């Protein structure tokens, strides 16, 4: 079984954690932006499935 040769330093651990959190923050920001554009109706790059009941009511 593979085991690390030496303990990972706190600096390296914190650096990796900051990278992961930064990537998560970017993904969350992008998701919020897409969600806002979808809700406001300004989204141009999405295709929505339209059910038959919605067409009958409109």
From Swiss-Prot:
UniProt name for this protein: Large ribosomal subunit protein bL32
Family of the protein in this entry: Belongs to the bacterial ribosomal protein bL32 family.
InterPro entries given in the database record: Ribosomal_bL32 (IPR002677), Ribosomal_bL32_plant/cyanobact (IPR044958), Ribosomal_zn-bd (IPR011332)
Biased composition (Basic residues): 1-15
Gene name of this polypeptide: rpmF
Region Disordered, residue ranges: 1-23
GO biological process, one term: translation
Keyword Secreted annotated: no
PANTHER family hit by this protein: 50S RIBOSOMAL PROTEIN L32, CHLOROPLASTIC, LARGE RIBOSOMAL SUBUNIT PROTEIN BL32C
GO molecular function per UniProt: structural constituent of ribosome
Organism domain of life: Bacteria
UniProt keywords, alphabetically: Ribonucleoprotein, Ribosomal protein
GO cellular component: large ribosomal subunit
């Amino acid at each position: 079984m593979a085991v690390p040769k030496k303990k990972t330093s706190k600096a390296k651990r914190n650096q990796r954690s900051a990278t992961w959190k930064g990537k998560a923050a970017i993904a969350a920001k992008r998701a919020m932006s897409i969600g806002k554009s979808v809700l406001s109706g300004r989204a141009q790059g999405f295709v929505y499935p339209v059910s038959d009941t919605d067409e009958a009511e409109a």
